[in-house]
UniProtKB/Swiss-Prot annotation:
Residues 3-125 form the RNase III domain. Residues 155-225 form the DRBM domain. CDD domains: DSRM_RNAse_III_family, RIBOc. One of its GO terms (molecular function) is rRNA binding. Its main location: cytoplasm. Its cofactor is Mg(2+). It comes from Blochmanniella pennsylvanica (strain BPEN). This is Ribonuclease 3. InterPro entries: dsRBD_dom (IPR014720), RNase_III (IPR011907), RNase_III_dom (IPR000999), RNase_III_sf (IPR036389). Belongs to the ribonuclease III family. It is found in: Cytoplasm. It is an enzyme of class 3 (hydrolase).
Length: 229
């Protein structure tokens, strides 16, 4: 089944397929849509991130933790996470949303991530979804500077995309250059091309997501030689 690939990317196999289907269903497609799951998932996500930040950064003030949490749970971050799972390929949308490109809309992608969190919680328990969320956010947490400004706390891919958008330039293009190793022990090499650089920049990582983030970080470093971003 097509959704099996999604479950592998999420790192969780649903016991109740109906919860997975509901989490992926937009209100434009069915009355059995995902908005109640989204409500639940939003609360769970905020709890998990708040708890994680509290224990990970014991010397950071309440205001600092609030800024970090806001960055991690905001719509753009969730939509970026959804794209890393190729979530748009699995959405159940009505014809109107399909024609208008709803599978790419950040609000729909972000809401679906929250609905999946709610669905996984109902399908399992708080401990399971907490472990999953921490795993999904590991790269972002590891690269987060608690003393940095709100803008610089964004992950490299998000910062690069916003850099290009501010200048009305084409968005970065990522493609796989090479995959080495057996399944579950692979090294991905990703090329990232932007219009302001003549050659693509290469990033490596143990997953496509990590390799893309590393490539984006290197592109940002290259662009910083020309202007302050």
């Amino acid at each position: 089944m097509l959704v099996n690939a999604l479950q592998e990317k999420l790192g969780y196999i649903f016991n109740r397929y109906d919860l997975l289907l509901q989490a992926l269903t937009h209100r434009s497609s069915s009355n059995q849509h995902n908005e109640r799951l989204e409500f639940l998932g939003d609360a769970i996500l905020n709890y998990v991130i708040a708890n994680l930040l509290y224990h990970r950064f014991p010397h950071i003030s309440e205001g600092g933790m609030s800024r970090m949490r806001a960055n991690l749970v905001r719509e753009n971050t969730l939509a970026t996470l959804a794209r890393e799972f190729n979530l748009g390929d699995y959405l159940q949308l009505g014809q109107g949303e399909l024609k208008s490109g709803g599978y790419q809309r950040e609000s729909i992608l972000a809401n679906t991530i929250e609905a999946l969190i709610g669905g996984i919680f109902l399908d399992s328990n708080i401990q399971t979804i907490e472990i999953l969320i921490i795993n999904w956010y590991k790269i972002r947490i590891d690269h987060m500077d608690p003393y940095a400004s709100y803008d610089t706390q964004k992950d490299p891919k998000t910062r690069l995309q916003e850099y290009m958008q501010r200048r009305r330039l084409p968005l970065p293009v990522y493609w796989i250059n090479q995959i080495i190793g057996e399944a579950h022990n692979q090294i991905f090499t990703i090329n990232c091309q932007v219009s302001e650089l003549t050659q693509p920049i290469i990033g490596c990582g143990s997953s496509r997501r990590r390799a893309e983030q590393n490539a984006a970080a290197k592109v940002l470093e290259a662009l910083e030689h020309n202007q302050n971003i």
